[in-house]
Amino acid sequence: MPYHSKSIKPLTSIVSYPERGDGGDNRYRGNCSPKLIEDLIGFFKPKEICDYMCGSGTTKAAADKAGIRSRLYDLHSGFDIMNCDIPERPEFVFCHPPYWDIIQYSDVMYKASDVMQKYGYDPKRLDLSRIESWDDFVKAMNYAMMKQFSALENGGRMAVLMGDIKKKGRLYSMLAEIVKPGTLENIIIKAQHNCFSDRTQYSGKFIPILHEYVMIVRKDSPVLIPILKTQSSTVDIRDMPGATWRDVVAAVLEQCKEPVALSFLYEQIEPHKKAQANKWWKEKIRQTLQINPMHFTHDRRGFWSLNRNAA
């Protein structure tokens, strides 16, 4: 009897697999537990599963156990997701992209020279895990995401396993920045086990990452596809609709190392939307300074500073 027709424990929004299970090569860094893919197959019951970044073949092992067909591809075996056409119209795609450059694959997990000899291209030039900048990685990841989603048959699904990266005090979130085409059906949190961070004591305010995400998107229309994507921008607080007068005045003063004249505050705020939206903006600045003694200090006549000791 095929695995996916058995009675299994339903998927929930949090999954955990302390024991990895059998399938794929556990020496292949970043390899996920086949139990996750087995549970996805058991829950959604596809007749076939495709994986275009298959790594060591964990998806095939899960599909074989479930008794369904699998089609697997990877850069190390002649398939470049950025330039090759997807040959199928998949019903279900499992995608486990690299987590930026945390683990590099070409010429680390496999020999680039072997790929060059067999397929005629240098995988290091095409490897998403060798992209230097985060922004360029996101662009490549999102192109690959849209390419796979576009190939889905109507009603098909993609399950994307991804994680977050921390570098130099900043979080780089794949979940936040990956493009989300179609219907966003589920986000599953997957606990990580046997991580390097489990054995490491961190100083400062570093919070170790002990989870990944599984994002499931569904194609509900063959032609018109809704897309949810992140747009990064920089906004001046003096132009932000939600900023109060106290916020704006404090922001200007926070840049100053010594008390400044009231005229300086006028100059800094006048060109911006906060002032342009209020006919009595000068009066509002003076009122804001006077009614917030906890935050602003009147140092001498006409000069103000930010009280940096305020709670």
Which role fits each region the language model picked out?
Residues 1-292, 298-311:
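Class I S-adenosyl-L-methionine-dependent methyltransferase catalytic core
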